[in-house]
């Protein structure tokens, strides 16, 4: 029974350490400014479409 908490703690420590493959994959994935620009642009596009489509249903594509 004494080994169980030690075993669980070791499993948690091993699971929390990122591997090299994960770090290399996410380093060059997407530049942060581009991601932030897309995050701001998407709600703006949705709000523009909502304004257009609310009074005129025919303008929705």
Curated annotation (Swiss-Prot):
Domain of life: Eukaryota
Annotated InterPro entries: T-conotoxin
Keyword list, A-Z: Bromination, Cleavage on pair of basic residues, Disulfide bond, Secreted, Signal, Toxin
GO cellular component term of the entry, any: extracellular region
Residue positions assigned to the propeptide: 22-48
Family that this chain belongs to: Belongs to the conotoxin T superfamily.
UniProt-recorded name of the protein: Conotoxin 3
